[in-house]
Each structure stands twice: as C-alpha cells, then as structure tokens.
C-alpha cells in the first residue's frame, strides 16, 4: 500500500470523506440505474461504459427539434449550427488530454482512428518495419496492428514486437520498456502502446517512452481508451506523434460514442505526410466549392473524412462540459484518494480472498483496480449484482472495479468492499 492517506474502515468515515468532497455535487449530474431494490446501484463500471449525463438527453433533443424545425438549414442556423458543431467540444477535449486545440479533433471511433493514424505514422522500410506493442493489449488494437503489418506485406509474427512482463510478474516495468526500445529501436517504425492496460489497469510513463522512442527514430502513438478522462494527460508536452481514444468509458458519451484524435503540432502543416482524405478534412474556406484537389486543414482536423454525427456530439458535449467545470487536476486528486480507499479496504479482507494485480504505485494506475479472487469469480459477480453493485468481468478471471471521481462516492467504495467481505466470510 503506497497511498499517502490515513483511512478508517467504517461507514461513518466514508460518509465523512463524502461530506468533505468538493466534487460531490457532480454525482447529481448523472443518471444511476436502479438496483434490485429500486435504489441507485453502486456503479463501478465506468471503465467499461460511463453513466449517462442528465444533460445528454436535453442536448440531443435540442438538435432533434432543430432538425424538425429547420431541415437542411440547421447546418447554418439553429441554436448550434451543425456545420461547426464539432468545434463546440474541441477546446474541452484539448484541455482534457493536455493538448492545443489545433492538435485535437473528435471524429469516428477508436479503431477507425487508429487505422487512419497508422496510415500516416506507420511507414515501414526494409530495415525499420516493426511495431512495438504491449502483450495483452486490447484485442482491437492487436487486430489493427496486425492487419496494418500484413497490408504492407510483412508477417505479423516477425513485424509485431511484444513487451511482456518478467517471469512471475503481471505488469511491465518501465525500465524494461525503455531497454527494449534502446535494443530494438533501430528496427521499429512505430511504438504503439496503451496509456492504461485494459486488463491490468497499469498506467505507462508516456513522456519517458516517447523520449526514448524518438531518440531511436521511431514514431510514437498511444491508445488512450482507458486514459482519457481517467489520467491527467499532457500530450503536447509529452510529445507523442499521435494518440486516439474513445469516449464511452470514462467520458460518459454513450455506447459506441465518437472517438478523439491527437496529432502533435509539429505535424500540423506537414503537406507530404500520407493520409486517407475526405471532404471534411478539406480547407473550410473552399470545402463547399467542391473542387477536385484536396487541401488539408492544418492540425488534427485535416484527418477528418466525413461530417460528424450531431446527436453523438451532443451527448459528448454534455459530459465534456462537466469535465471542464470540475477540472482534471481536481478529478485526478479525488481519483487517487478514492481508489486508494478501495485499496485500503480490500487489503483488510481475509487473507488470500483477493489479490490486486494493478500496480500499488498511484503513478502507475488510474481509477481501476483489477482483482483476482479465490474461487469462481462469475458467481461473485452475480452476488454483487444482486446486491446492487455493478462492476465487470474480463476473462480469464479478472473482476475490474473503477470508481469514477465524477460520480462515485467513498460510500460506494465502502459498500462494495463490505459486500465482498460478506462473501469472503461465508
């Protein structure tokens, strides 16, 4: 246990922490599903699908009304003209990931954006053709990387280089990542890692990895699916070439929601960087002249293909406004304390009942703790559900619990662990 807080194992202490929480009011900005008893559930699955912001339905309804009232004229008129609607979330998203607005665009979904970024930043040569990834990355990332390698005529078994934990360990050591880059960097075209591993909950040192990879001449990209809205990110300063993320997890924009893209400012005006092109990435001043020659917008917007879905943007806007109001510094501070309290309580359960596989160092994790339990985990998951507690299961034997600082409370964490304790003592 490495958290610097003094905690107590009592419901009164959990309620005291909630009363002192400056962010507690944001909980009321979300809809909580009812549990079996009709009361709001303890929802610890924001790392899988975030809760619905109360403003989401209103924002979507506004656009439905403008569509009914204006038809095609809604692109230029209405409360929020659709032609520029995506720009309403650009600055919010940029602050969220520590970037400049020029470097960020909201579009598509994560796997689509990852492919678009690899078109530009995976440029294999005979000597430098490998992609460095983490073993056990989210499957869609694995599929995308392997298919890009095959598209360029290489065998994925030779061109995909995996980072694996040491024998007997479950997470990667930063020094091992950096040593692998130093040893193999001359043959690596792209370093492509997650910011937080979806299964272990381990967060990586983006700045150190980027610096090491750039020193060896590699492009660098990150999947922020479990980082955006969870970690305090500094993409511009850390300097990766690109990053992609989804917004249905910690960003609470709904199932299948739009993703985001970061392209570093140094590439903003690079005309000869290959990319797939579409009309929405064309210069706004001449887009509707419908000319035959593509002229890319500067920055991340130049990678857009199509005009974005307005209703999805409306849902995302409802959530990003809350993040902007709360601020990632305050949210991350609460998150460290909230997950630290979860860790403290789990450590007090009967010995051998549960093992935390996520790093104990708060700098190497976000909100999520990945848990391995003695016995069959899916039965325990059902018991939690029957008690009005929602977390999720990942094969082979991991239950993930992720208290989200925007809407979870210390009492939520206490109730979760006390339910586990009842199961452990039976």
From Swiss-Prot:
E.C. number: 3.7.1.3
Catalytic activity: L-kynurenine + H2O = anthranilate + L-alanine + H(+); 3-hydroxy-L-kynurenine + H2O = 3-hydroxyanthranilate + L-alanine + H(+)
Cellular component GO terms held in the UniProt record: cytoplasm
Reported cofactor(s): pyridoxal 5'-phosphate
Residues reported to bind pyridoxal 5'-phosphate: 110-111, 138-141, 223, 226, 248, 279, 307
Gene Ontology terms for molecular function: kynureninase activity; pyridoxal phosphate binding
Annotated metabolic or biological route of this protein: Amino-acid degradation; L-kynurenine degradation; L-alanine and anthranilate from L-kynurenine: step 1/1; Cofactor biosynthesis; NAD(+) biosynthesis; quinolinate from L-kynurenine: step 2/3
Gene Ontology BP, a term: L-tryptophan catabolic process to kynurenine
Pfam families: KYNU_C
UniProt protein name: Kynureninase
Source organism of the structure: Myxococcus xanthus (strain DK1622)
